[in-house]
């Protein structure tokens, strides 16, 4: 599916390629990727290309000379008013003023489907995100991962992919053993027994709360069980409670998963064992000091890794390899993991293991997410005033609301550290970016209430002369609306939701400027109708963009 700006861009790109062939700079079968996009400076036109600079090596001429020759052969589309050569050899395209009014009937005809793409048609993608240990509560870093993963899944769905959201439950291994022992210790303490708390146990208040809930439900029912059996029984109940708490926190944050995948199930089904056996058969395992080692160095890694300890217990790495094998065996074309930046060393290890198993490691994409810091009153907030421990996602949402939290978490690139300004997120002013965007939508709905009071209805688009929209404020808003599908494509291909957050903030800015300088009601009839249709097109895009972010579009503020 191609939209107005994409069609124009495609037409110009084709014309540039043909000009390069006619000028002898390219052979007809040559493939050359060149940029043709909106320049950063408005003075440089509507689209700019670096094609001339990419042809210097083959043409053996300077880029400005190449650009001049290209212009001699260029078929200029009707929408283009003029073409200029700038700087070292950029070719800038300036469109006629009225080209962009055609975006209004396009948006109105597509409605909520405006911006939907087919770049992912027929492809299945899995996005695995958060996957926090179920031994504690979700913190702010998990919140950033939740917003990033959920919004990215929304964007990929809009780009035509079939998307599955997945949470990997780390319910096996040493951490669960320590968790079980911690719950048992707190349980026994609450029942009046003196116990030594496990050295590597979990000390959080939430573990005491969990143990208290178990005592309230079951009393001393587990006291007389053998120690190991008691630990497992208590741990199982506690883990289920923790998992339900995590699910509730995420649902409150607007995140719902398609699959909750248990690490324990990989061990119980024998998948870990089968994966280890397959690596052995493919010649990538060897025995040393009684343990089984993965010969990762054969495939370029710095060192080999233990997969099965000498006591016969598989490592976490072995389970993780089995999990990723399972993902690809489920038929996903692309597997996306969202991990904290502290996992960066694990990325190449996982890709190497997939290669050893015979899978294409390029089908695994790992997004590494940087840390979040919370600020209030200009100072770093390290601990919750309420609990004296780390600040949970629930506490943050209670403080600023879902809308602000989700927006703030994705308004910076995932690979940049995020300083979350608590005061700004709560502010009801134009300084708060999410408020600023939502206020644009609320202003539109307020205008519609005025229309309703005055008996004004939305006119059929074919009855309105849209060319009357010619002021700078109107044209800037129209151009930005035309860029919406391009932004979705950019977000989907770069796996970068922050572009959508930025786009909506800019769109709100263009709308507020238009609203403050162009009256919609009480002006000449055709102008009023044209502006009303522009407002409706803006409403559709604003509402859809906010929905993709999982942020509400209020009717009143």
From Swiss-Prot:
Can you state which reaction this protein catalyses? tRNA(Arg) + L-arginine + ATP = L-arginyl-tRNA(Arg) + AMP + diphosphate
What's one GO BP annotation on this UniProt entry? arginyl-tRNA aminoacylation
Output the InterPro entries linked to this UniProt entry: aa-tRNA-synth_I_CS, Arg-tRNA-ligase, Arg-tRNA-synth_N, Arg-tRNA-synth_N_sf, ArgRS_core, DALR_anticod-bd, Rossmann-like_a/b/a_fold, tRNAsynth_Ia_anticodon-bd
- Predominant location of this chain? cytoplasm
Enumerate the UniProt keywords alphabetically.
Answer: Aminoacyl-tRNA synthetase, ATP-binding, Cytoplasm, Ligase, Nucleotide-binding, Protein biosynthesis
- Keyword Zinc part of the UniProt annotation: no
Q: Name one GO cellular component term.
A: cytoplasm
Entry similarity comment = Belongs to the class-I aminoacyl-tRNA synthetase family.
User: HAMAP family given for it?
Assistant: Arg_tRNA_synth (MF_00123)
Name the UniProt record assigns to this protein? Arginine--tRNA ligase
**Lineage, broadest ranks:** Bacteria, Bacillati, Bacillota, Clostridia, Thermoanaerobacterales
Q: What gene name does this entry carry?
A: argS
